[in-house]
Swiss-Prot record:
It comes from the Bacteria. Residues 1-21 form the signal peptide. The keyword Transferase does not apply. It is found in: Cell outer membrane. Part of the outer membrane protein assembly complex, which is involved in assembly and insertion of beta-barrel proteins into the outer membrane. May have a structural role in maintaining the cell envelope integrity. GO terms for molecular function: protein-macromolecule adaptor activity. It comes from Pseudomonas aeruginosa (strain ATCC 15692 / DSM 22644 / CIP 104116 / JCM 14847 / LMG 12228 / 1C / PRS 101 / PAO1). The gene is bamE. A lipid is attached at C22 (N-palmitoyl cysteine). The keyword Membrane applies. Residues 123-132 have a biased composition (Polar residues). Part of the Bam complex. This is Outer membrane protein assembly factor BamE. Belongs to the BamE family.
Amino acid sequence: MQNAKLMLTCLAFAGLAALAGCSFPGVYKIDIQQGNVVTQDMIDQLRPGMTRRQVRFIMGNPLIVDTFHANRWDYLYSIQPGGGRRQQERVSLFFNDSDQLAGLNGDFMPGVSRDEAILGKEGSTTVTQPADQQKPEAQKEEPPKPGSTLEQLQREVDEAQPVPVPTPEPLDPSPQ
């Protein structure tokens, strides 16, 4: 009896230890995105002096247009990955009295895009081939050998005559 209890206790602890690395499947949580998606490329297209219409074409409709500050447009974007922390980005565009873009403020600034920041100073990659693998200069095209299929096809193409496009006859306007 004592041996059976000890054996059951050991098996229970071994089973619990084996299940310690397992977990119950969690509920799937979707990514929650809200607001206007604003990219660095969109910000880089903005120039001082652009009209509201041009800015709206590039950026889309602003999320917030303040009634008391009509010369300010706010673009907000937030994303919360399923089960993760919420990240928020904000850009405010300011217009002067003549409805032209005067400045911007926020998490994005004109300059290096995120891709370029990840890749380094330059976003472009230069590939050079070793001298022995470089492509030879363009070879001059040799005429096809007489009697070859290529020569026969070339002759048929050269001898092709244009054919006039047929025009449909007008419909009879008189009723029957």
